[in-house]
Amino acid sequence: MLSAIPAAHMEFYENLQNYYVMAPYLCVHAGIHPQKSLQEQTEAELFWIRNKFIYSSHPLPYTILFGHTPQTDAFFDLPYKIGLDTGLVYGNKLTCLETEERILYQITRGKNTIKQIPIHEKWESSPRLTMP
C-alpha cells in the first residue's frame, strides 16, 4: 500500500512539523501545555492534550487554533484560543477560519450549503488581536 504513494508525497508528510506559526496564531492539533514554552511542548501534548489546555490561559504570544476536542460550535477564549473542531465525524459540521478576514466557514454534514459567519466582534475586547 505504501508503495502506491509517490516518494515526493512521502517526503512531504515525513517533514511536516507538529505545529505551524502564522502570527498572531499558532496552529496545533490538540493544544499546548499552558505552563511550557513552545520549544518545551512534547509531541504528545500537541496531539493529545485536552482539559489542561482548554481550561487554562497561557503565556505564549499567540492565539492557539486547535481541533481534537469536538464542540457543538466553534469555541472562543480570546485572546488565548479558538477551537475549530465542531464534530463533523459525529454528524455535526465542519468548520474552518479565514484568519485575515475573520470569517468562519461551516458546512453541516450531509448538506451542501456553506455558511459564512463574520466574527470580527469577538476581537473587540482582545487588545492582543486588534484588526490591522
What are the residue ranges of the model-derived segments?
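Acidic, His/Gly-enriched loop-helix segments that form or flank divalent-metal centers
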Residues: 1-94, 99-115, 119-121
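A short C-terminal boundary segment appended to hydrolase-like catalytic domains
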Residues: 124-132
